[in-house]
Amino acid sequence: MPMHGAQRKLLGSLNSTPTATSNLGLAANHTGAPCLEVSIPDGLFLSLGLVSLVENVLVVAAIAKNRNLHSSMYCFICCLALSDLLVSGSNMLETAVILLLEAGALATRTSAMQQLHNTIDVLTCSSMLCSLCFLGAIAVDRYISIFYALRYHSIMTLPRAQRAIAAIWVASXLSSTLFITYYDHAAVLLCLVVFFLAMLVLMAVLYVHMLARACQHAHGIIRLHKRQTPAHQGFGLRGAATLTILLGIFFLCWGPFFLHLTLVVFCPQHLTCSCIFKNFKVFLTLIICNTIIDPLIYAFRSQELRRTLKEVLLCSW
């Protein structure tokens, strides 16, 4: 089920601007050029959202349960899980509401539905911004832990982390409200795109620098023990592969959505862009997939968290 612009404000306007939508059918008739439209079944979309919801709830529950995980690093991971939870939950909620409306199972006033859509849009937009911010915060935290290891606990204190977390949530909520209010301004969409690019550059620079330091450290150990060079090369290749996967997943899952925003600004009536607009739900699905992958990368690699997670699951039974 493709999403229509009338059903959303900011996110809906990204799907198809009124001008682009009205011209899309005429353009297709005149040129006869087919558009590649990937259909995402509602059942699949809701299932992925449910997997993300359960996965991130488990991460939040595990971190909340174990006091050993109440450090600044795990606070950022917990907030990332919470924001990912809200991303998937808000998208599931709106999809469910749309399905109920189409089935005639939900009847309400237009003003009430508009208010509901506005609320969900603010929640979705703010949770997306939070998710990006906490991905950047985790990168900064890891950078400080490597390059300022001796001062890490004095720099990244829990109160400072809590203030940073509060600032991120407040700024994201206020920004989202402004974005929803002025969604039809090109500057709003460009601000979102610039923000995404800034997070991408920040993460790339920090993780590349961390990889270079790790390779340098490994090379020093190898020279100290007079081992062969291939071991160092193998470490460098593994580190580069890990970095490529980390940044690649981030770019592949979030990039299409922000490419969509860019095209809405610069070519809303172009036929090729109009074809891309038809795949808006695919881009949202990729973001949901990222919310599923994030716990695997940032949370479940911790042995302490995995052990606590087992305790949470056993207690639930």
UniProtKB/Swiss-Prot annotation:
Family annotation (Pfam families): 7tm_1 (PF00001)
Molecular function per GO: melanocyte-stimulating hormone receptor activity
Family annotation (PANTHER family): G-PROTEIN COUPLED RECEPTOR (PTHR22750)
Lipidation (S-palmitoyl cysteine): 315
Family: Belongs to the G-protein coupled receptor 1 family.
SUBUNIT field: Interacts with MGRN1, but does not undergo MGRN1-mediated ubiquitination; this interaction competes with GNAS-binding and thus inhibits agonist-induced cAMP production. Interacts with OPN3; the interaction results in a decrease in MC1R-mediated cAMP signaling and ultimately a decrease in melanin production in melanocytes.
Record-level GO BP terms: adenylate cyclase-activating G protein-coupled receptor signaling pathway
Topological region Cytoplasmic: 64-72, 141-163, 212-240, 301-317
Protein name as catalogued: Melanocyte-stimulating hormone receptor
Residues linked to a glycan: 29
Keyword DNA-binding in annotation: no
Gene Ontology cellular component list: plasma membrane
Mode of membrane association: Multi-pass membrane protein
Location of the protein in the cell: Cell membrane
Main location: membrane
